[in-house]
């Protein structure tokens, strides 16, 4: 009897340990976020360990963590000059409050670990960004640093896609700057459109967002600068995302049908007095995929100050 009780006790301990390990792995997996880049401003002043600035920085980052469950944006300030620290976070408007909070929690911890003594730093994840600085940046447009992530797969209808994308971005900017009265998330708009062209049909999903501390004019400026960088970088990519300190853009194009076949060649004339006609070339040339390109591959473009 004692042996049976001991065996059951051992089995219970084993199952409890297994359950704990499983729940721990699940928690870690759910909290994973795609880190894109960290910028520690090497040109800013440094602070020393246990200094007033370090204390104020931790106060700001802790405040951002606490506020991350309340919305997609918040800012915080701590201390008096010359040790004033300002911070903010911005989450993508299309993610849940839980995902936003998890991302900000991770970002605020990592930025202090990676930028140990710099007075200004930025950290970009696919779902959020966090920054702090000794300089005031609220209500101002910052073009850099920024991070672009894009696919190495070509977009559909390659010959016409850059213009289609440019037109879509212009439309998004107009809608985003008028969204404070249209959306629960200020300066956020997402769109899905089915594009029908002779070469084939495709869906294009897109979104644009500005930090709520910007006014409509500065939001427009920020998004236009982001569009310019994205179009110069990757206007032939199937998807791309750019994240700047004050705004972000994303798009993804999904082909729905293949281009139609070329028109058939006319039959050769029956009269032997004429040579047979050569086959007509295709009206539209389909883009060739570069060696090594695939749908799952992507690349980051990073530009600092």
From Swiss-Prot:
Gene3D superfamilies: Gnk2 domain, C-X8-C-X2-C motif. Residues 258-271 have a biased composition (Pro residues). Residues 288-305 have a biased composition (Polar residues). Residues 258-305 are annotated as: Disordered. It comes from the Eukaryota. The keyword Ion transport does not apply. Residues 1-31 form the signal peptide. CDD domains: Gnk2-like (cd23509). Residues 35-137, 143-256 form the Gnk2-homologous domain. It is found in: Secreted. One of its GO terms (cellular component) is extracellular region. Pfam families: Stress-antifung. Keywords: Repeat, Secreted, Signal. This is Cysteine-rich repeat secretory protein 4. The lineage of its organism: Eukaryota, Viridiplantae, Streptophyta, Embryophyta, Tracheophyta.
């Amino acid at each position: 009897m004692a042996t049976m009780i001991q065996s059951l006790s051992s089995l219970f301990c084993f199952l409890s340990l297994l359950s704990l390990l499983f729940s721990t792995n699940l928690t870690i997996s759910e909290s994973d976020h795609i880190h894109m880049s960290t910028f520690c401003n090497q040109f800013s002043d440094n602070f020393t360990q246990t200094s007033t600035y370090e204390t104020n920085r931790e106060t700001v980052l802790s405040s951002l963590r606490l506020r991350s469950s309340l919305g997609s944006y918040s800012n915080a300030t701590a201390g008096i000059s010359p040790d004033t620290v300002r911070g903010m976070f911005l989450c993508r408007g299309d993610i849940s409050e839980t995902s936003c909070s998890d991302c900000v929690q991770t970002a605020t911890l990592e930025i202090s670990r990676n930028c140990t003594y710099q007075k200004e730093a930025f950290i970009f994840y696919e779902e959020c960004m966090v920054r702090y600085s000794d300089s005031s940046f609220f209500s101002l447009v910052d073009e850099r640093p920024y991070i672009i992530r894009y696919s190495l797969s070509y977009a559909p209808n390659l010959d016409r896609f850059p213009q289609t994308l440019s037109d879509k971005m212009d439309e998004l900017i107009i809608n985003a700057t008028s969204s404070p009265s249209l959306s629960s998330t200020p300066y956020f708009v997402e769109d899905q459109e089915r594009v029908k062209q002779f070469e084939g049909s495709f869906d294009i999903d897109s979104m644009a967002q500005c930090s709520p501390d910007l006014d409509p004019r500065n939001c427009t400026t920020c998004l236009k600068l982001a569009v310019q960088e994205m179009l110069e970088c990757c206007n032939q990519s199937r998807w791309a995302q750019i994240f700047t300190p004050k705004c972000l853009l994303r798009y993804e194009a999904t082909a729905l049908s293949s281009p139609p076949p070329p028109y058939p060649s006319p039959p050769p004339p029956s009269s032997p007095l004429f040579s047979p006609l050569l086959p007509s070339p295709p009206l539209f040339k389909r883009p060739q995929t570069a060696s090594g390109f695939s749908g799952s591959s992507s690349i980051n473009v990073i530009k600092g100050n």
